[in-house]
């Protein structure tokens, strides 16, 4: 569960390292789960990269500590909250994705992120 003011790690190579959620997109949303789009501000960034500190970005959540329950009854949880920065057309801004990605992103039509990920859980 990601709420506003939550810090997330970035799982791509855009240059941002940490972001803070400021808004969850969608009708009447109070918290976000895997596959939801958020608006965030960059809190830590590597210098001279695509994304700078204090930039406002859109991101899709790819890992949460709370996890997600599948129809088979299995629950998937991760060690950290992580997101991938995306463009307005829902394609990733970076060219590489780091760490495992949940399979639920395919249902939300983030196929490009799935293809860049090294491991799909």
Curated annotation (Swiss-Prot):
Annotated GO biological process: translation
Pfam families the UniProt entry points to: Ribosomal_L14
Keyword hit for Ribonucleoprotein: yes
Compartments reported by the entry: Plastid, Chloroplast
Keywords: Chloroplast, Plastid, Ribonucleoprotein, Ribosomal protein, RNA-binding, rRNA-binding
SMART domains per the UniProt record, alphabetical: Ribosomal_L14
Key word Chloroplast present: yes
GO molecular-function terms, A-Z: large ribosomal subunit rRNA binding; structural constituent of ribosome
Top-level taxonomic group: Eukaryota
Xref: NCBIfam families: rplN_bact
Assembly notes: Part of the 50S ribosomal subunit.
Official protein name in the record: Large ribosomal subunit protein uL14c
Organism: Euglena gracilis
Lineage: Eukaryota, Discoba, Euglenozoa, Euglenida, Spirocuta
Gene that specifies this protein: rpl14
């Amino acid at each position: 569960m990601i709420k506003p003011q939550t810090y997330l790690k970035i799982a791509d190579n855009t240059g941002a390292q940490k972001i803070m959620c400021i808004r969850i997109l969608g009708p009447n949303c109070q918290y976000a789960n895997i596959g939801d789009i958020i608006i965030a501000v960059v809190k830590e960034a590597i210098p001279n990269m695509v994304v700078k500190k204090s930039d406002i970005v859109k991101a899709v959540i790819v890992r949460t500590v709370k996890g997600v329950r599948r129809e088979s009854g299995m629950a998937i949880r991760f060690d950290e909250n992580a997101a991938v920065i995306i463009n307005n057309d829902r394609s990733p801004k970076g060219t590489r994705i780091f760490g495992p990605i949940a399979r639920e992103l395919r249902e939300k039509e983030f196929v490009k992120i799935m293809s860049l990920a090294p491991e799909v859980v």
